[in-house]
């Protein structure tokens, strides 16, 4: 969907740009005629009227060119709005948040192939980034950057903590262990609905659910502090996690030019723990602000506006 919209904007900009060029040429020619700079006795009144009609038609189409051009440039190279559709980044981002993504944060890229044209700065650990899914470029995800190229990452299933060391190699091991601290967990108002069926397995039973309350924990990775949600009442197993070649499960070494992403809602997020690393070329940009927030649940209509959520993202 993301690439389709970009291609549509590009084609629309090119087509209206052609009409805009014809309109400019036609307008200049009419200007010369009206000033009697072109001496052409074959221009009768009827032909002049037809020329005016054609000019009006061209003007109507050409008027869209500046609009499409501005949208294409801003959306492709500067800022792009996104909507948060799921709760994988709770409590930092909620369903119904509309965010602004800075497209030039990780380099100015060609909008179709995403080849980096001008490098700006590298992604930082702790950034919240929008990216294309590694295997399906039509799907955009938003997660927090946890692992940088060369990092060795270990995820502890028991306490759900992460352990990171930088510039790992088989010969010298880790260069530096990243400081990661966790607060004591406390109860929160965030709820995870667990759906189930009754004995008769009736279709309407999709509306029957039990609710589990998330615990909230402060996670501090070096100097980046943020909150994460955990379902401590649920114990995960290793089976579904991504296993890197020649590595034990739950331990990964981030390849060169790739990144390890995780959602802040740790027990309700499909991320690099499940499908692997994200290439740098897949990074769309850095999420910087919430510009609108509707009070809504997933797959439901909004019931209000959350003005207090508008502002910067941390």
From Swiss-Prot:
The residues on the Extracellular side of the membrane are 85-314
Give me the Gene Ontology terms describing cellular component.
plasma membrane
Report the record's Gene Ontology biological process terms.
signal peptide processing
Q: Which reaction does it catalyse?
A: Cleavage of hydrophobic, N-terminal signal or leader sequences from secreted and periplasmic proteins
Alphabetical list of Pfam families matching this protein? Peptidase_S26
The protein's enzyme class: hydrolase
Q: Where in the cell is it found?
A: Cell membrane
This one is known as Signal peptidase I
Q: What species is this protein from? A: Buchnera aphidicola subsp. Acyrthosiphon pisum (strain APS)
Taxonomy of the source species: Bacteria, Pseudomonadati, Pseudomonadota, Gammaproteobacteria, Enterobacterales
């Amino acid at each position: 969907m993301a690439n389709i919209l970009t291609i549509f904007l590009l084609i629309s900009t090119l087509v209206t740009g052609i009409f805009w060029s014809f309109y400019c040429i036609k307008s200049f020619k009419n200007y010369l005629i009206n000033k009697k700079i072109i001496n052409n006795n074959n221009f009768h009144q009827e032909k002049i009227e037809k020329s005016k009609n054609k000019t009006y038609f061209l003007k109507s189409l050409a008027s869209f060119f500046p609009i499409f051009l501005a949208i294409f440039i801003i959306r492709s190279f500067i800022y792009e709005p996104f909507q948060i559709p799921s709760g994988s980044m709770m409590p930092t981002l909620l369903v119904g948040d509309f965010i602004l993504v800075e497209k030039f944060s990780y380099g100015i890229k060609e909008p179709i192939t995403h080849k980096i044209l001008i490098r700006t700065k590298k992604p930082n650990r702790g950034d919240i980034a929008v990216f294309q899914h590694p295997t399906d470029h039509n799907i955009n995800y938003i997660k927090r950057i946890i692992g940088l190229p060369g990092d060795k990452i270990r995820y502890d299933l028991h306490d759900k903590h992460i352990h990171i060391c930088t510039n790992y190699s088989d010969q010298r091991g880790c260069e530096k262990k990243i400081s990661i601290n966790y607060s004591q967990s406390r109860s929160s108002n965030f709820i995870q609905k667990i759906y189930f069926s009754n004995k008769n397995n009736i279709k309407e039973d999709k509306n029957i659910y039990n609710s589990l309350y998330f615990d909230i924990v402060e996670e501090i990775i070096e100097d980046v502090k943020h909150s994460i949600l955990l379902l401590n009442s649920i114990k995960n197993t290793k089976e579904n996690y991504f296993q890197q070649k020649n590595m034990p499960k739950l331990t990964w070494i981030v390849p060169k030019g790739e990144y390890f992403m995780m959602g802040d809602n740790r027990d309700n997020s499909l991320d690099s723990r499940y499908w692997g690393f994200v290439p740098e070329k897949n990074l769309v940009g850095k999420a910087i602000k919430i510009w609108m927030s509707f009070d809504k649940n997933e797959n439901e209509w909004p019931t209000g506006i959350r003005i207090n959520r508008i502002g910067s993202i941390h």
